[in-house]
Amino acid sequence: MIDKDGNTLSFVEEHRIRRTLRTIRSRVRRLIVRAALDALEDGVGSVNLVAPGDVYEELFSFIGAGTLFTEMQYGFVRPVSIDDFEEVEALIVRGQTEGHLLPRTPEQIAQILPSCWGYRIGDEHLAGICSLLTEPYRRDRAGEITAMYTLTRFQGEGVAAVLVREILKEARARRLKYLFACTSDDLVAALFSRLGFERARASDVPAAKWRGYDPSRIASLSILRAHLG
């Protein structure tokens, strides 16, 4: 399924299916969507709608091609477990390859895995991840949101926003003074701003953040900070 702008809808909850039915002109397409809704009403947990030629991409790639129909909000955020490490590492490497994440060595990735959180689609795969890094900043009682990445097929579905909101809750529960994030992506910076983060200077975050950091790169970063007091 696609939205009014021609973008694929990765997942659609039941209440949105009913609205969608009213806008579909094709009788065949309306019948297909109606069948998915009927299945949900009959107790099926979820229905995946995908074109026959896209089945392989849907099942065996990170990109995906179909639309997942669910009765209610299907994703949830939780800290990753050791059983998730391999999947999380694969997403971080993918994000680095695509240029969305700062390059890290395998050893550096291994160090942040225990601090990662994931947005999981039901009992299936991870749609997005991020890390709440606190150990380097414990003296400052601060935390950094880093290694945030959302799979291409779920971008625009609010996954990153849900992750950040959950991290904010966790940070408050840990009585951190503030959270910060650094990004060179204007869209990511805008997301943090919408969620209450404010623009900051390099000196407004722990000095430990910049140890070994390329000084020339700092100037290109948007540094955002959320006070939690």
Q: Locations of the language-model features?
A:
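C-terminal catalytic "cap/lid" subdomain
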Residues: M1-Q111, G156
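A conserved beta-strand-loop-helix scaffold within acyl/acetyltransferase catalytic domains
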Residues: P103-T150
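Conserved active-site alpha-helix within GNAT-family acetyltransferase domains
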Residues: D185-Y213
